[in-house]
């Protein structure tokens, strides 16, 4: 179970989606801080604590990553491939949250180690319902593995 102080990292380039997801999280009662990375390279820099993300008091390591697939600079599947190639990130919870429902994307995301594949809802009510489901399962019920020795601090 994640504590309400643990950060969620949303990887999303569409500012409208960021706004609506933030609203849905608020309505669902998710208290966790939400950090946003707008492209694939930013999420890699964030997870490595590099560049502007070096200050871990300002940019804490996330308990959960919500990853869009269609991103500028580096696509979501490439980010997922990179995450799973890093020994210290093997247990990081990465959920794909995308507008694609293409079965090839679904299969590839799971093959690369996504823990879930969620299609972004269009309506506000469905977004709030999704946020509640994320809260209940991933933040309240699920016991995530530790990041293990040598994992991020």
Where are these regions (language model features)?
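Non-catalytic signal-transmission and effector/linker regions of two-component phosphorelay proteins
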Residues: 1-9, 15-35, 41-44, 48, ...
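Active-site residues of response regulator receiver
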Residues: 67-69, 98
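Short amphipathic alpha-helix used as the core "switch/output" element in two-component signaling
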Residues: 52-55, 77-90
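Alpha4 helix (beta4-alpha4-beta5 surface) of REC/receiver domains from two-component response regulators
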Residues: 3, 19-23, 77-78, 101-118, ...
């Amino acid at each position: 179970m994640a504590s309400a102080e643990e950060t969620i990292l949303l990887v999303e380039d569409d500012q409208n989606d960021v706004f609506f997801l933030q609203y849905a999280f608020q309505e669902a009662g998710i208290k966790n801080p939400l950090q946003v990375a707008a492209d694939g390279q930013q999420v890699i820099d964030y997870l490595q604590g590099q560049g502007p993300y070096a200050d871990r008091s300002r940019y804490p390591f996330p308990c959960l990553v919500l990853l869009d697939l269609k991103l500028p600079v580096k696509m979501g599947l490439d980010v997922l491939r990179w995450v799973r190639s890093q020994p210290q990130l093997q247990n990081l919870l990465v959920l794909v949250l995308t507008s694609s429902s293409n079965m090839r994307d679904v299969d590839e995301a799971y093959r690369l180690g996504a823990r879930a594949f969620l299609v972004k809802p269009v309506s506000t009510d469905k977004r709030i319902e999704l946020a509640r489901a994320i809260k209940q399962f991933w933040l309240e019920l699920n016991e995530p593995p530790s990041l293990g020795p040598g994992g991020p601090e």
